[in-house]
Amino acid sequence: MTEISRFDAYPPTLTVNPIVPADAPATEHLVWTIAQAAEERKAGDLVILKVTDVSYLADYFVICTGFSRTQVRAIADNIEKQVELVHGQLPTHTEGNSESIWVLQDFGDVLVHTFMPEEREFYKLEAFWGHAQEQTLADIATAIGVAYNAPTSP
């Protein structure tokens, strides 16, 4: 039986930077795709934690904020859509989509947490995983061999 994506009815278009060297590390490439997809939907306060040395759950956590339930859902949907297009994979598990105050997406080596501001402040994952190594998009870009120009404020 063939698995059908919920995006099959309206095929999405690739919007994240697809030009990544073929020999780029797969996990960092996945983090790059997730971060770019989140930023595309105007996610706030994007944090990337490398938890390889402190957790067996995943290699990376990507944490971001949406400022309405609609935006949280849009961020999570765009991440799923772009990861499926670029990497051909869907999350193995997703929680919180119906409430859209905290959506957790499990992509195996990368866990994505998209929060509303109040929930992010309450759970404080960055503090809980404070011993993890924080990465920037520039760090991830360097790891996969692409150029990254940080957005400038107007």
From Swiss-Prot:
Primary site of residence: cytoplasm
Pfam families tied to this protein: RsfS
Molecular-function annotations in GO: ribosomal large subunit binding
Gene Ontology process terms (BP): cytosolic ribosome assembly; negative regulation of ribosome biogenesis; negative regulation of translation
Claim: Cytoplasm is one of the keywords in the record: yes
Gene Ontology CC, one term: cytoplasm
Domain of life according to the entry: Bacteria
Keywords: Cytoplasm, Repressor, Translation regulation
Keyword Repressor: yes
Localization per record: Cytoplasm
Annotated function: Functions as a ribosomal silencing factor. Interacts with ribosomal protein uL14 (rplN), blocking formation of intersubunit bridge B8. Prevents association of the 30S and 50S ribosomal subunits and the formation of functional ribosomes, thus repressing translation.
Subunit structure comment from the entry: Interacts with ribosomal protein uL14 (rplN).
Family (UniProt): Belongs to the Iojap/RsfS family.
Protein name: Ribosomal silencing factor RsfS
Organism name: Synechocystis sp. (strain ATCC 27184 / PCC 6803 / Kazusa)
